[in-house]
A protein has these predicted regions:
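Conserved loop-alpha-helix segment in the C-terminal half of the alpha/beta-hydrolase fold
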Residues: 224-253, 296-299
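Conserved HGGG/HGGXW glycine-rich cap/lid loop of the alpha/beta-hydrolase fold
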Residues: 50-99
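Active-site loop/oxyanion-hole signature of alpha/beta-hydrolase fold enzymes
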Residues: 91-131
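Conserved hydrolase catalytic core segment
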Residues: 126-164
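C-terminal motif of bacterial Sec signal peptides marking the signal peptidase cleavage site
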Residues: 18-19
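Active-site nucleophile elbow and catalytic-triad environment of alpha/beta-hydrolase enzymes
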Residues: 196-212, 226-230
Length: 299
């Protein structure tokens, strides 16, 4: 029951985050900048017959930020505000979400991923670092699979390879189903139809074979919280399936850590992006550190 109440609380929080992010997430400066509705930073382009809205901020190496299911650029306010001082930030409303157009066809993670690749091509940047949260974490991994030449480093927060019981506990799957049923009742409006399509996707997708992770050869940081929606066992399996990966689990946090504790979330990403990737050779490096410790104590 406690776990179910926690999941229900998450649902309420997620609705508030998606609805209010431009005003209520990030720093005071982020609240003052209308991320997701900034005419000075926004533009559109067309890919696969769909008009897609994006915004860019800052200068430096390109960093692509990818929002979660039903979200928009506005939900990335705390991340845009933090990283724009160091990077050229690129953020896009996924098809059927935010200010991007309705695709008038079923939505898939592969289509959204190909939209991101097209945006990179459109802006003539790349390869880029990419940070994705939730659905965006799935798209970040798929960029590494489908468009490996367009990415340098990947940060994937709480991704899943499929919507099955290995990824989600039964009460979480029930939550997704109830959210779909609620959106189904609103399908008489254009926005309601969009929401039903996007939320309903979570019940059927993604469908990424675990063996496909071996194709993601760029350095990848896999993130999750210890009270996440995605089962930790599933997240760890994703980490282990990636050939050049690091893993970080946020203690006493939830799926909403980018909004609840953006300082910790952003700092973890900062370190990964700024530090050259190094694969740890477990036994030799552990023993080397141990010898240094013992030498220091002997002095």
């Amino acid at each position: 029951m406690k776990r179910l109440l926690s999941v229900m609380s998450f649902a309420a929080a997620l609705v508030l985050v998606v609805a209010c992010a431009p005003q209520e997430t990030g720093t005071a400066e982020a609240a003052a900048v209308p991320y997701g509705a900034n005419k000075e930073a926004g533009a559109t382009f067309v890919h696969d017959g769909v008009t897609l809205y994006y915004e860019t901020y800052g200068r430096g190496e390109p960093l692509l930020l990818v929002h979660g299911n039903g979200g928009s650029i506005g939900t990335l306010a705390a991340q845009i505000d933090h990283f724009k001082a160091k990077y050229q930030i690129i953020a896009m409303d996924s098809r059927d979400q935010g200010q991007s157009a309705d695709s008038h066809e079923p939505i898939t993670y592969e289509k959204m991923t190909d939209d991101l690749a097209a945006l990179i091509e459109h802006l003539k940047v790349g390869p880029v670092d990419v940070v994705g949260w939730s659905d965006g974490g799935v798209e970040a991994l798929l960029l590494g699979v489908r468009h490996p030449g367009k990415v340098k480093k990947i940060v994937s927060m709480a991704p899943n390879l499929n919507p099955g019981p290995e990824a989600f506990d039964p009460e979480v799957s029930a939550l997704f189903k109830s959210m779909t049923e609620l959106s189904d009742k609103a399908r008489n409006t254009p926005e309601g139809r969009r929401q039903h399509k996007v939320v309903g996707m979570m019940l059927k997708e993604p469908n990424i074979p675990p063996a496909m992770l071996a194709n993601v050869t760029v350095p990848t940081l896999v993130l999750a919280s210890d009270h996440d929606l995605v089962r930790l066992e599933h997240v760890v399996a994703i980490y282990r399936g990636l050939p050049n990966a690091q893993l970080a689990i946020f203690p006493n946090r939830t799926h909403l850590i980018p909004f609840d504790d953006p300082a910790q979330f952003n700092a973890t990403i900062d370190r990964f992006l700024a530090t050259p990737f190094k694969e740890i050779d477990l036994v030799p490096e552990t023993m080397g550190s141990y010898e240094k410790l013992m030498t220091g104590l002997a002095r």
